[in-house]
Amino acid sequence: MTSYSFTEKKRIRKDFGKQRSILEVPFLLAIQVDSYREFLQEDVESTKRKDLGLHAALKSVFPISSYSGNAALEYVGYKLGQPVFDERECRQRGMSYGAPLRVTVRLVIYDRESSTKAIKYVKEQEVYLGEIPLMTGNGTFIVNGTERVIVSQLHRSPGVFFDHDRGKTHSSGKLLYSARIIPYRGSWLDFEFDPKDALFTRIDRRRKLPVSILLRALGYNNEEMLAEFFEINTFHINPDEGVQLELVPERLRGETLNFDLADGDKVIVEAGKRITARHVKQLEAAGVAALAVPDDYLVGRILSHDVVDGSTGELLANANDEISEDQLTAFRKAGVDAVGTLWVNDLDRGPYLSNTLRIDPTKTQLEALVEIYRMMRPGEPPTKEAAQNLFHNLFFTFERYDLSTVGRMKFNRRVGRKDVLGESVLYDKKYFAERNDEESKRLVAEHTDTSDILEVIKVLTEIRNGRGVVDDIDHLGNRRVRSVGEMAENVFRVGLVRVERAVKERLSMAESEGLTPQELINAKPVAAAIKEFFGSSQLSQFMDQNNPLSEVTHKRRVSALGPGGLTRERAGFEVRDVHPTHYGRVCTIETPEGPNIGLINSLAVFARTNQYGFLETPYRKVLDGKVSDDVEYLSAIEENEYVIAQANALTDAKNMLTEQFVPCRFQGESLLKPPSEVHFMDVSPMQTVSVAAALVPFLEHDDANRALMGANMQRQAVPTLRSQKPLVGTGIERAVARDSGVTVNALRGGVIEQIDAARIVVKVNEAEIGGGTDAGVDIYNLIKYTRSNQNTCINQRPLVNVGDVIARGDVLADGPSTDIGELALGQNMLIAFMPWNGYNFEDSILLSERVVEEDRYTTIHIEELTCVARDTKLGPEEISADIPNVSEQALNRLDESGVVYIGAEVRAGDIMVGKVTPKGESQLTPEEKLLRAIFGEKASDVKDSSLRVPPGMDGTVIDVQVFTRDGIEKDKRARQIEENEIKRVKKDFDDQFRILEAAIYARLRSQIVGKVANGGANLKKGDSVTDAYLDGLKKSDWFQLRMKDEDAADAIERAQKQIQAHEKEFEARFADKRGKITQGDDLAPGVLKMVKVFLAVKRRIQPGDKMAGRHGNKGVVSNVVPVEDMPYMATGESVDIVLNPLGVPSRMNIGQILEVHLGWAAKGLGRKIQRMLEAQAAVSELRKFLDDIYNHDNAINAQRVDLSQFSDEELLNLGKNLIDGVPMATPVFDGASEAEIKRMLELADLPQSGQTQLYDGRTGEAFDRKTTVGYMHYLKLNHLVDDKMHARSTGPYSLVTQQPLGGKAQFGGQRFGEMEVWALEAYGAAYTLQEMLTVKSDDVQGRNQMYKNIVDGEHEMVAGMPESFNVLVKEIRSLAIHMELEE
């Protein structure tokens, strides 16, 4: 049984799972964190770094040599500095969180004169290569002050793929096979058949060439090509006896001869009969070695080599010629004794390469190279060198072509080699053997006689011949995951390659002018490439920070889109579909609805990537029907060979599979197998789904479409004021909250020393304290009321009290949407399924007023409003409270600097920051001149451009930040904010130091009390040190004590050193912080000052807000009804929410009904415990009742709770926390059964049907029949009516058409579209229609006139010409058609 930690003892979930969990839920952000850690390799020494990430990129580009080869720049190592600002400061200042990268390079200059390349001089130096973004602990990046996530990409793995066109290319429907070699970077190489069965190649999808041109360019001639691809039949030509064939009986199978096939006198096959496998066996048994054949059997066969007259050297026939009767006569005449022909047939030995050679115009290697050059560079005149270099650079140089380790592994496996290692370029023995450079010699020496290109063509012809199968590109063995680290590495390499070009140019100067490495390298291209990737790549996304779950799922997302991936428009149905290999790797449920469906997926709970980037999933080993606890991770490729049982396969107490036939999966099919043939078994029932889907209880009872919506909508839940744990969960809520990073978890065990709303101080256990200056105190600062990316509120609340004993990993503080360390997205509401006066028609939701009253769904949203003072052409803008033509009342919330006070309650239209902008001198009217002369008005040369609260928003100002450009004097408010911040930091540091100091003294006291002293203040030699004596001493005098015991003396010395070290450290840290607070801010060009105001907006639930359960049962609130009108139960308790029962059957999400039943039981059990506590029943009675709840099930693997671990006090505390309901967990696919739900209802003294009689709140009459009632975890989604509703009076118009803009952001109007016009036409409402199309839209004069008329009290309108009609006329004129209106 498990032992429970301090946090877990507070509230225990009753778990209905039958499967013992073999694996704990892994760290959910591992894919992000591990990938980036491997990229940086920050904590690894330079010499021990693996060939990954930054190190690999730097190694691949360096050394850079000059064109002459006399100077080289070599890479030694790199190190990352410390970030200038920490995460919090970066968020506040809008900076990027990163560290400077410093690379050590060595410049080597060789002596020109010496022949042996003697070194003239060497210079080593550190070079700054820009800022590298750092990942926060939660797997995000802070770019320009906002948190972003780099989503992993699922792309086609490099390697070789074989495919066919599914008969779509040619009208006959013939399958045309093709092969494609895809490198990690470099040119693609395709091979394809055409309808006439000739084989072609394409490079980078350009014009196709016969494949023999490529082989000829590699150095093969016709004979060699034919010898590679065909087996050869040898015929002996005797001048007298006709022709003899060297017989290989197998090759005759399927042929029909026009002569009898005989062994001696015995005829085996008669003429005209087809030769079968039986005949072949007879021939083999008879041992016939040669076969006399008539001449016409040889005619028409294809020669495998050139035939030459031995005496004269005359060429009689070329290889690949068909033998004619004339040639056969010539062979006899010339005394040719044997010829070889290609063994081909129509069935399984096609003459493909032979056909191809016939259409190949080239004869020599050079011609072939030139032909390839012409195809790649049309229009450029080819030279021999250019053609050779181009061809070599395409596939055979390490700079331009890289298959990568993954590509090489996939390539070798696909062409059937055992070895998975090899070169990252395409290798061809013959090609490299003919070259003379060092690299080629090394390659030839290291490798056997292989040719990558030839082997691919061989496999392709085998597939065309009917042996072998094409690949499935949607198989997860052919798609791999590219995570953050790998993408960052690629981008970094691109930046380095740009630098390399520039360095090469400058290196030649370095030889003569003695430049240093720093002067050679310009870091800008690297920094720019990285900045561009993290700031604006398609896969660098603004983090979804609605709630902890949405953060976790965003980081676990896998996208097929992005650079080097698919595009939405081109992605077909197959790519988006669920594939058998998704099982346990990618969630089969969670994917967006809409155009991205199936292209964006989520990792399954236990999935991880292997060293090659393929997804793998864990399985338990099964040996001879016995299931072991050994776990092995298999990728989709490895899984193909094994039979795998489901997680819920029945086992006995000894872990033996009990069924005669076990349901299994094998090669993507489901089948039944005896236990002895099973190799593996699933680890957990929730293995197939993602985190979001695994949070849906009773998922197994929901239709997949609704489960998808349920999983997706949980991510949109807004954190409520007080989070409530779900009464019915699935047991992984704690893991999600833990890994999301929104809670505060103890880094080390200890005792809570001090606590307030913003800070928790832990005195660490002796055993966990490190050496050196570690004082054994951990201080956790909590996040208070900050804004998330989605404008929701992030706030942490402490959960512990002073004196609590905690262990490592315990939850010390809850964040948004967490409740005692468990994910809590919504509220547990009492729900009744019944219609109520049509208010729940079509998925509408009826709410009780009590829900609003108790603030169950009240959420806090934090809006950030920014006011920027710029330097304009007419002079600087100014932030001040002195604004022209504005009443005193409008300014009463501003201080003298013109900035709103903290705590002010503001409404739409209120001024928050006063700002004036200079305007050009306008011509004054005589009246204005007179007024100016009398009153001396000066303020008219500025206009009011203050920051006002936008329409539809009201709230309380909770924070103001003022940023001032360097070199500009700070205003009073800025100075005040600065002083407050310095005070806060000083107090924080002082407190921290005081706590540390106290901890050190307390430890010292325990180490010296009772020990004998050799002297000290008022202490004689030989006296013992007592507590009373120490209390009477000043703390600083403790260090004067001289102890007899060496350990005690050491302790005093160590304590003194520790205190001094900490004092120094705190002073340095404070000075650093103070410097950062007081320094000017780095603002955008032209910006003098920036003020940010944060508003807290309280949003109560109201009609129009969208709500949902966890089963895809979404709806919109239609009405809020007084409590007394809601249906109520016999106990007098009224329900909170009334849902429409018709929303269930057609949607097939029955999970919600089961959840409601179990939730009612959970709540009922809580009430029962409450009654026990109120009656002050004996603890033993409570213990027995809890035991009844938790341990009623006697199944082998049932999850039990050992209540004997709880002291009476802990048990009472547990009971108090269960009053609100006993939380239950029904894991996905392993949940509570109907019988168990009934048993829980029975324990709670509730009807087993889960239904009860309800009474109408308005009349008091009972309803006709009983109603399903119970508790469901219901969420409020971030689609609030306040954010969507808006109204336009007059506002901006489109520039060209002069029609009103659309949308809330533009303060736009409602479009009166085509169909609405038809409706008015149908009614014959001509005047209304005219008004809609003219003065209310784009008749400029008309609408201005209308305004004047309304002001003057004349209610009439004159419709003129709509502006859009003028636009139409002008467009027609632009087509040179003169069109004008007759007056």
Curated annotation (Swiss-Prot):
The keyword Transcription applies. It comes from the Bacteria. Signal peptide: none annotated. Its EC number is 2.7.7.6. The keyword Glycoprotein does not apply. It is an enzyme of class 2 (transferase). GO terms for molecular function: DNA binding; DNA-directed RNA polymerase activity; ribonucleoside binding. GO terms for biological process: DNA-templated transcription. It catalyses: RNA(n) + a ribonucleoside 5'-triphosphate = RNA(n+1) + diphosphate. Gene3D superfamilies: 2.40.50.100, 2.40.50.150, 3.90.1100.10, 6.10.140.1670, DNA-directed RNA polymerase, beta subunit, external 1 domain, DNA-directed RNA polymerase, subunit 2, domain 6, RNA polymerase alpha subunit dimerisation domain, RNA polymerase Rpb2, domain 2. InterPro entries: DNA-dir_RNA_pol_bsu_ext_1_sf (IPR042107), DNA-dir_RNA_pol_bsu_external_1 (IPR019462), DNA-dir_RNA_pol_su2 (IPR015712), DNA-dir_RNAP_su2_dom (IPR007120), DNA-dir_RNAP_su2_hyb_sf (IPR037033), RNA_pol_bsu_bac (IPR010243), RNA_pol_bsu_CS (IPR007121), RNA_pol_bsu_protrusion (IPR007644). One of its GO terms (cellular component) is DNA-directed RNA polymerase complex. Keywords: DNA-directed RNA polymerase, Nucleotidyltransferase, Transcription, Transferase. The RNAP catalytic core consists of 2 alpha, 1 beta, 1 beta' and 1 omega subunit. When a sigma factor is associated with the core the holoenzyme is formed, which can initiate transcription. DNA-dependent RNA polymerase catalyzes the transcription of DNA into RNA using the four ribonucleoside triphosphates as substrates. Belongs to the RNA polymerase beta chain family. NCBIfam families: PRK00405.1, rpoB. This is DNA-directed RNA polymerase subunit beta. It comes from Xanthomonas oryzae pv. oryzae (strain PXO99A).
